[in-house]
């Protein structure tokens, strides 16, 4: 049974002009995600940050709460398997989570499907 579906599209270029990037990055990325982000350079770093931001937005929409008092960026952690497939490894939902990320030169689109009962 599908519990929720969330989708988000984000402009990667907006992450290049953040007024306080360190604060934003600490807010969005978990410590584990930050370690992986630190290894990225140039455009790939912006794609990584935008992708993680967008996945967390999609997750919050599928979960039905949005990001705010009940759910924040640190409640959700994204990881990758051996072939680069994204997976959400930390989250409050008790069922199965499916995630998809796609990039173009300027945009990232993500979808999260929550399956099962919470």
UniProtKB/Swiss-Prot annotation:
Catalytic activity of the protein: apo-[ACP] + CoA = holo-[ACP] + adenosine 3',5'-bisphosphate + H(+)
Annotated signal sequence range: none
Required cofactor(s): Mg(2+)
UniProt GO molecular function: holo-[acyl-carrier-protein] synthase activity; magnesium ion binding
Subcellular location(s) of the protein: Cytoplasm
Keyword Cell membrane: no
InterPro entries to which the protein is assigned, alphabetical: 4-PPantetheinyl_Trfase_dom (IPR008278), 4-PPantetheinyl_Trfase_dom_sf (IPR037143), ACPS (IPR002582), P-Pant_transferase_sf (IPR050559), Ppantetheine-prot_Trfase_dom (IPR004568)
Gene3D superfamilies, A to Z: 4'-phosphopantetheinyl transferase domain
GO biological process terms, semicolon-separated: fatty acid biosynthetic process; lysine biosynthetic process via aminoadipic acid
Binding site for Mg(2+): 8, 57
The keyword Transferase is assigned to this record: yes
EC number of the protein: 2.7.8.7
Cross-referenced SUPFAM superfamilies: 4'-phosphopantetheinyl transferase
A cellular component annotation (GO) from this entry: cytosol
Keywords: Cytoplasm, Fatty acid biosynthesis, Fatty acid metabolism, Lipid biosynthesis, Lipid metabolism, Magnesium, Metal-binding, Transferase
Pfam families the record matches: ACPS
Role according to the record: Transfers the 4'-phosphopantetheine moiety from coenzyme A to a Ser of acyl-carrier-protein.
Family indicated by similarity: Belongs to the P-Pant transferase superfamily. AcpS family.
The protein, known as: Holo-[acyl-carrier-protein] synthase
Organism for this UniProt entry: Pediococcus pentosaceus (strain ATCC 25745 / CCUG 21536 / LMG 10740 / 183-1w)
Gene that this sequence comes from: acpS
């Amino acid at each position: 049974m599908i519990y929720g579906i969330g989708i988000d599209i984000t402009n990667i270029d907006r992450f290049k002009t953040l007024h306080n990037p360190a604060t934003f990055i600490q807010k969005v990325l978990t410590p584990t995600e930050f370690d992986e982000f630190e290894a990225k350079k140039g455009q790939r770093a912006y794609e990584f940050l935008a992708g993680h931001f967008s996945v967390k937005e999609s997750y919050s929409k599928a979960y039905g709460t949005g990001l705010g008092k009940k759910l924040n960026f640190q409640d959700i952690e994204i990881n990758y398997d051996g072939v680069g497939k994204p997976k959400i490894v930390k989250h409050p939902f008790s069922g199965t989570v499916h995630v998809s990320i796609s990039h173009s030169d300027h945009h990232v689109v993500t979808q999260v499907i929550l399956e099962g009962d919470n």
